[in-house]
Amino acid sequence: MRGCLQPARWLTTATLRRPLLSCPRQLPTRYNPFPRPFHHAPVLQARQPSKPLSLVEERIDAIPIERYRNFCIVAHVDHGKSTLSDRLLELTGTIKPGENKQVLDKLDVERERGITVKAQTCTMLYNHRGKDYLLHLIDTPGHVDFRTEVSRSYASCGGALLLVDASQGVQAQTVANFYLAFAQGLTLVPVINKVDLPSADPERALEQMKTTFELDVDKAVRVSAKTGLNVQELLPAIIESIPALLLVDSWYSTYKGVIILTRVFDGEVKAGDQLVSFATGLKYTVGEVGIMYPSQTPQSVLRAGQVGYIYFNPGMKRSQEAKIGDTFTKVGCESLVEPLPGFEEPKSMVFVAAYPVDSNDFHHLEESINQLLLNDRSVTMQKESSEALGAGFRLGFLGTLHCSVFEDRLRQEHGASIILTPPTVPCKVIWKDGKETIFTNPSRFPDEDTLRVKVAELQEPYVLATITFPEEYLGRVMELCEANRGEQVSMEFFTATQVILKYQLPLAQLVDDFFGKLKGSTKGYASIDYEESEWRKSNVVKLQLLVNKTPVDAVSRIVHSSQANRLGRQWVTKFKEHVERQMFEVIIQAAVGRNVLARETIKPYRKDVLAKLHASDITRRKKLLEKQKEGRKRLKAVDSAMVAIFLARVPVNNGGSKDLFVWVWMGVWIPRQL
């Protein structure tokens, strides 16, 4: 660094911020994230604490940056990450033993489903060989749909615990998360969990880790997170193996506005500091700083190397101001600081439309979605409208589980009443003039005439799927992949009984409950991970549902032509079961362009207008029947209103081991008066 001192900086995660230098000091070269020197920033007055330091803050103040450790836990779904986090918090005295369960799973949806959705952080203090160490633990999700949370967490860490279930061994998402961590250059500590189970086979799991990841398994720690067996051996391993030193989150408080989670790279930040955002150029006054211990614990200052939270006074009220990966520095030092590169923007793979049940709740729904976007920036949002459902939003997600969890959070945390359309995947249109357009909304897909005249090629997205399962189910899994238009890439037997199979699969097939079918075919023993692969030429069509020859745009889908007939027949059959009879005939059709693939008719109720008529009055009889006929025709064509748009949970048998469930939405035309 040529003897130059650096101005303080912070990086936010969902709204990552970093503090500016209050009292600049020279840091060791290995902690300098900048390739070239910067000039000295103006030295500000030393802080004058307004109240005595707490015991925790006194211990933190005495710890040099060389004894900071940032680490996370890398694992497959349900291999015990959150339980192990609880044991570590208990060992360090952060929480009381035996009184907590999955402390870092803070969302209701996480506790209900038993999975980790949001990466959560906690600061721990641990005395090792007579010296205090500051440990920042980040509990990360394991499911592929939340890979963005995982990658952001890895960016703020120096190392990770590679956790494997002793009874299940290495799984698909273990492999995927390992390569994410490896790409970030993290130091990995092998850990075998659940060694107390009767079905545990630690030697097999260690051999898989050695073969698959080429790790030194002699240093692996065998633990039981549930009972606490050998967990005390992990903390010394973390301190001795993980090197000393971008965290990634923000959330919303009704009273404080946006609260950001940040890692301080240089200098320090405290209440009263004036900060500026590199992303927006907006300036803020720090109202409070603190650490997660494990809940929000105020501190007088955050120093370089620490991970903590910041809120501003007055608060940041607009969630759009919070940019994941943003860099903050002190006002006046902007020219002396180079912002960090931030994070790679995730690409949405699955799209749904969201509409409020009551159109008057549109603005409340918009505000609720924006607040959730603060700490889940992998979701994309744009406004749209539907003739059937009115104003709403087109939301993009990383997968179907991601979508389902987001919906649950809207309902539980914000009390939103919403209607979601079936998930769809994007489609790329290559026009004859060479331009390309990606359509995420099926209702905007070109019609039949436009496709014939102006379109050169249609493409759909493919993914590279990695499937791990016992060898005995190999035939069933390959048959399932072939039935879903898959192309085999490779097959590897990494133990005598376990297979890793890689297939190129259309993303649309994965959205159509491929995972449920896979679990059914392997009795629940298979796991799958996938990554974006490429766009491929495909014969896709827009499948529409028509009610009385009027398209219901909210449920249209882009499907492969080979599936259009089957899906169309399923649609009309199941919709018929959930539409009540009316005073007029209801015709339900599934169509591709002008070609009607399937039709069901719901006969009307018969109102006997001749009941009180004398049998011999033929003229009067004809007149009443003609009047009834004209009335029904008028109701059906003009004088009818859409007064019921309902959500039905319809069982659809997809040929698996059990009935699967598909969410379907539909509009029904009902007369204003009979």
Swiss-Prot record:
PROSITE patterns per UniProt: G_TR_1, G_TR_2
Catalytic activities: GTP + H2O = GDP + phosphate + H(+)
Its membrane topology: Peripheral membrane protein
Enzyme Commission designation: 3.6.5.-
Location in the cell: Mitochondrion inner membrane
GO MF: GTP binding; GTPase activity; mitochondrial ribosome binding
Ranges for domain tr-type G: 66-246
Keyword Hydrolase in annotation: yes
Pfam families reported for this sequence: EFG_C, GTP_EFTU, LepA_C
UniProt record, GO biological process: positive regulation of translation; translation
Family stated for the protein in its record: Belongs to the TRAFAC class translation factor GTPase superfamily. Classic translation factor GTPase family. LepA subfamily.
Main location per the UniProt record: mitochondrion
PANTHER family named among the record's database cross-references: TRANSLATION FACTOR GUF1, MITOCHONDRIAL, TRANSLATION FACTOR GUF1-RELATED
Keyword hit for Mitochondrion: yes
GO cellular component: mitochondrial inner membrane; mitochondrial matrix
Alphabetical list of NCBIfam families matching this protein: lepA, small_GTP
InterPro entries named in the record: EF-4 (IPR006297), EFG_III/V (IPR035647), EFG_V-like (IPR000640), G_TR_CS (IPR031157), LepA_C_sf (IPR038363), LepA_CTD (IPR013842), LepA_IV (IPR035654), P-loop_NTPase (IPR027417)
Organism: Arthroderma otae (strain ATCC MYA-4605 / CBS 113480) (Microsporum canis)
Protein name, UniProt field: Translation factor GUF1, mitochondrial
Keyword set, alphabetical order: GTP-binding, Hydrolase, Membrane, Mitochondrion, Mitochondrion inner membrane, Nucleotide-binding, Protein biosynthesis, Transit peptide
List of residues binding GTP: 75-82, 139-143, 193-196
Transit peptide, start-end: 1-48
Database matches in SUPFAM superfamilies: EF-G C-terminal domain-like (SSF54980), P-loop containing nucleoside triphosphate hydrolases (SSF52540), Translation proteins (SSF50447)
Role played: Promotes mitochondrial protein synthesis. May act as a fidelity factor of the translation reaction, by catalyzing a one-codon backward translocation of tRNAs on improperly translocated ribosomes. Binds to mitochondrial ribosomes in a GTP-dependent manner.
